[in-house]
């Protein structure tokens, strides 16, 4: 079993989405920013209450979730 100590889920916070340490920063936001080309250092500058390990664990969590379920993708014709 995977342990993600920095990832929390609370139905009362951000609609129950996975967040970083109970804060209003979602895993999806972190992954989206990195995917858009932002560096970890830039994220940490914008969110000084986050630690590098928070960002890395968010990426590991997202990768784990992606491996846990298959989603059919439509192929471009």
Regions found by a protein language model. Give the residues of each.
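N-terminal first-folded block
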Residues: 1-25
């Amino acid at each position: 079993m995977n342990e993600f100590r920095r990832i929390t889920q609370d139905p009362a916070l951000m609609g129950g989405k996975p967040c970083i340490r109970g804060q209003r920063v979602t895993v999806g936001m972190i992954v989206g920013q990195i995917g858009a080309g932002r560096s970890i250092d830039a994220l940490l500058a914008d969110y000084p209450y986050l630690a590098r390990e928070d960002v890395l664990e968010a990426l590991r969590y997202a990768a784990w979730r992606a491996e846990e379920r298959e989603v059919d993708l439509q192929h471009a014709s």
